[in-house]
Amino acid sequence: MRFATRVGAYEIDSVHSQPQVAHCHAFFVPNDLRGQGLAHILKSHQKATLASLGYDFATCTVCGSNAAQQRVLTRAGWVRIASFTSSKTGEEVEIWGCEVAGACSTAYITMGIQHENLLDRRRKEALL
């Protein structure tokens, strides 16, 4: 299922044989909004959504050269589980995971709220 916000979008699907495991994909922030910390807000939104949907664990994949996404995942409490070379692209692909009810949810949601407050202040200042 696709979830869209003001700062980007992502998708969450249940793993077929393990319905308590979510696979997260298609996470993106539009190019014109990048570099403002909004991926952290979007990741926080994703965490809250995963928790509200009752998942126990989440996985995602990221290109091994995508340092920005790796930083977002690390800061959110995700851990790199494995990597492999894609037979389609020849690039390294990393598999990341996180316990939804564990460290990657509560602390990160709090951080996301702080980022949202900062974003709201910036928007108000821009309107003045």
Enumerate the predicted regions with their spans.
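Short acidic/glycine-enriched loop/turn segments that link adjacent beta-strands
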Residues: 18-20, 66, 87-92
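Polar/charged side chains located within well-ordered beta-strands of beta-rich proteins
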Residues: 10-13, 23-24, 43-46, 73, ...
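Conserved acetyl-CoA-binding loop-helix of GNAT-fold acetyltransferases
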Residues: 29, 35-48, 75
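Acetyl-CoA-dependent GNAT
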Residues: 1-25, 30, 122-127
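Conserved active-site alpha-helix within GNAT-family acetyltransferase domains
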Residues: 40, 64-82
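C-terminal "cap" of GNAT-fold acetyltransferases
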Residues: 86-128
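Conserved GNAT acetyl-CoA-binding A-motif
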Residues: 50-62
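A short, internal acetyl-CoA/4′-phosphopantetheine-binding micro-motif in the GNAT/acyltransferase core
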Residues: 26-34, 62-63
